[in-house]
Amino acid sequence: MAVQEIWLVRHGESVANVAAARAEAAGEDLIDVPYRDADVPLSPLGEEQSRALGQELADRRIDDVPVTLWVSPYLRAQQTIEIALAAGGLTEPAKRVDERLRDRELGVLDLHTLQGVRNRHPDEERRRQWLGKFYHRPAGGESWADVMLRLRSALADVDRLEGTERLVVAAHDAVVMMVVAVCLDLDEPALMEFARTNAVANASLTRLRREHAGAPWVLEEFSSVEHLDDEEVTEHTGRKDDEHVR
């Protein structure tokens, strides 16, 4: 038995997402978040989004085949899947918390708005413009290529999973995007074009499928939020080079 499906869940809206949107709208340089990135919790809306996600997972019968759960160590991702499983009345499957699934590290640019990056770190902004989003690594942080490298390592473990047909990954928008890029073998231009026209919404569901071990992965669904009919849909992503948002 081999993993045939990967279901990717982005965490619900976080309090840092809310603070970042507020800081951007106010034209501020810095985002006021009293947590380190790993400890950022969900917002009240994020909790509601997670409950709606849980009902969707139950409706889709996520546990109708053997399931394994991989989770980012960051609080917002863990809260999302815990709330979702409880809301859907689902039993927690075999779980692994894996640091390779953490969000992208922004280094000196963390908690800066886009304006703040330009005002306080103009050299980093010039480097980003020159290198491009895929290769730019802010001081003390990671490039998209760095995130992709650690996710290649994690995905190499997929074929070593025993007794599992469906892998559920609860993590972050950068992780969802990079897992899709690795599975579909997207190069830099293809990934940048895909990211330009597609955003990973909060509490969204993305699905990849293959026929058997070694077969190519197919993207069956990307950032589905149909289950958020009664909740606000939020993106809070780096789609417009707004790289600060958690």
Q: Which positions does each model-derived feature cover?
A:
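Acidic, low-complexity terminal tails and accessory targeting/binding regions
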Residues: 1-6, 90-92, 104-116, 181-246
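Short, active-site-adjacent cap segments at secondary-structure transitions
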Residues: 15, 76-78, 103-104, 175-177
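Glycine-rich phosphate-binding loop signature in dinucleotide/nucleotide-binding domains
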Residues: 60-65, 158-165
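Short, well-ordered beta-to-alpha junction loops that form the rim of enzyme active sites
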Residues: 11-12, 71-75, 100, 169-174, ...
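Short glycine/proline- and acidic residue-enriched helix-loop micro-motifs
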Residues: 33-41, 125-145
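Generic beta-sheet signal
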Residues: 6, 67, 165-171
